[in-house]
Amino acid sequence: GLKNTVWEMDDMPSCYTVDRLVKLRMDGVKFMIRLNPMDERSKYTVRYCAEAVNAAESAGLPIFIEALYVETTETGFTMKTDSESLCKVVGVVGALGCRASGKWIEVPLNHEYAVPTAATTCPVLVVPDEVKSEPIEVVEEYTKEIGISSNIRGILLGRNVMYNESDPLPIAEAIADIWHKGGNAEENYKRCVEKL
């Protein structure tokens, strides 16, 4: 939604359609949904998203949905990442459309991550906290979710990896190595730096 507009929670699609993505031979569909149960306009966003899920399924495209729960405050809308809020939005996203096949849910990281990831049988991609910037701390932040839930299938690399003051390549490689092979954050990062 357009920030600070009266229709911000009525987050209508304004860019690519699934038909256009198919014509461009794209590999999938990606969007974000902000659910605000106390704002009636949110119901329109839920409908738009359900229609997009159905269109993607009909086209045979996987769909990746970032699930965000927001509440209305005096200063606008604030994202909530407590487990109860995340379970609600993950449950809604999991139920969007006619089928769950091909649907991946991107879930913001919190301190009880096993709880919201258990709210769906869909594959989950971790959306980590991007506060840390020191390379080893970033690797630790991006790998602490491993093994929490069997439906966690990967992680989204954010700004603190892509635009880190240090070289982002060994950070990303260390994260991938730990996700696929296990190991220690510091040792993996140092090994990846030495490979350069």
Regions found by a protein language model. Name each.
Residues 127-130, 159-160:
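Short, loop-centered acidic/histidine patches that primarily coordinate divalent metals
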Residues 2-5, 10-122, 132-153, 177, ...:
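Alpha/beta enzyme core
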Residues 148, 162-196:
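C-terminal helical cap(s) of enzyme catalytic domains, especially alpha/beta-barrels
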Residues 154-162:
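Short acidic/histidine-rich active-site segments
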